[in-house]
Amino acid sequence: MKFIVKLFPEIMIKSETVRKRFAKILTSNIRNILQKYDEETAVVRHWDYIEVRSKNEENREELIALLQRIPGIHHFLEVEEKPFTDLHHIFELTLADVAQQLQGKTFCVRVKRKGKHKFSSIEAERYIGGGLNQHIESAKVRLKNPDVTVRIDIEDDKMMLVKARHAGIGGYPIGTQEDVLSLISGGFDSGVSSYMLIRRGSRVHYCFFNLGGVAHEIGVKQMAYHIWQRYSASHKVRFIAINFEGVVGEILEKVDNGQMGVVLKRMMVRAASKVAQRFNIEAIVTGEALGQVSSQTLTNLRLIDEAADALVLRPLITHDKEQIIAMAKEIGTDDIAKSMPEFCGVISKNPTIKAVREKIVTEEGYFNFEILESAVQNAKYLDIRQIAEETEKEVVEVEAISVLSENEVILDIRSPEETDENPFKSDTHEVIQMPFYKLSSQFGSLDQSKNYVLYCERGVMSKLQALYLKENGFSNVRVFAKKIH
């Protein structure tokens, strides 16, 4: 099994030195991700593409899914490589492979060639296409908009028949740009803005300001872990949680109602700047979009930026909500975001849309900044991979089992895509599919006389959700420790 990975076009037009560096980093990223899943995967860098090989055909679908989510890959070709002796031999190999596929279809042949041969790419296309047309009676040649395009790459004495072409997410490889710190709230905007910086080549660390207790923190951890696992697992990143309840309480008590929103955001960027300085991070990322809420006017954004000691990046600044939600659906964070409450917007009943610097400074003069300093000093710093380990400690009262009792129902909390791909089947027990992001709103409607065993692929989400349900008074939950294949 072989894949030919093509780099993002913006990489290819850079100078030779920069292109080599980017390609080298992308090769390393691909290797880091694929070899966690398949240790025998080989990743080799060439001048204008990266070659991925695996002997384990059963891993094909998973390798394709992983490659589709690695930043820096424009597209990749799934190919079958064979040696050949001459042009007629290429035709014979192609005929044997595509004869069944071309029955009753229109087709054309496209050839890309490298090395010294007695024929050109166009001559190869004509010869192979003509031969296929003669030998497959029900097939017809059509050069424009054919049903099937037969793609062949020829390099020296080997031909590669392209079996499929898969799109990547493009962008730059992670590590080609500097690190950033994303202020993640668990909503639509912060998840998408984090992804956009990942796609642009930055390693994204996450800073979360907890305004809503344990349940809020668990939800945000789910989103950060989801984004990291899907799009940036080639790199270690940090998750920083800062308890901001004291800061919010001080603002509610001391600050004029209309100025609360801007003051809260200024406190957040101050705290984030201190965290960024600690790790030599030059920029913080927010999900703000111009005019979306009252604090996001140009005047207010400028005043918020003045409180920051780091560059503030706003990748969504010109996006509307529909675009942001559509992007959230693409990256798989929309359902998590739907279940997330928005705390920042509710602390001020009549927020100002055009804050005045002097008034903001006056209001902040009433604020006890020792509370902010204390919140930053007591922040929790995690390697994002520790979310799973932390869950082990936090969910000590939730039993993990591998054998089911009679009165237990399996609650498959994976996403619909995962359950469609690899459904959980049981001949002896009822299986209910309820994605983890719907548990908070729908678990209570289940028959509470039964016991529920939560299942997910790696056990992280099931444990986080078990903790959430326990926090909310549900004692009839356990975690299924067994994996399905």
UniProtKB/Swiss-Prot annotation:
Transmembrane segments: none annotated. The active site is at C456. It is an enzyme of class 2 (transferase). Its main location: cytoplasm. GO terms for molecular function: ATP binding; CCA tRNA nucleotidyltransferase activity; tRNA binding; tRNA-uracil-4 sulfurtransferase activity. Residues 404-483 form the Rhodanese domain. One of its GO terms (cellular component) is cytosol. It is found in: Cytoplasm. Keywords: ATP-binding, Cytoplasm, Disulfide bond, Nucleotide-binding, Redox-active center, RNA-binding, Thiamine biosynthesis, Transferase, tRNA-binding. The keyword Cell wall biogenesis/degradation does not apply. Disulfide bonds join C344-C456. Residues 61-165 form the THUMP domain. ATP binds at L183, I184, K265, G287, Q296. GO terms for biological process: thiamine biosynthetic process; thiamine diphosphate biosynthetic process; thiazole biosynthetic process; tRNA 4-thiouridine biosynthesis. Its EC number is 2.8.1.4. PANTHER family: TRNA SULFURTRANSFERASE. Belongs to the ThiI family. This is tRNA sulfurtransferase.
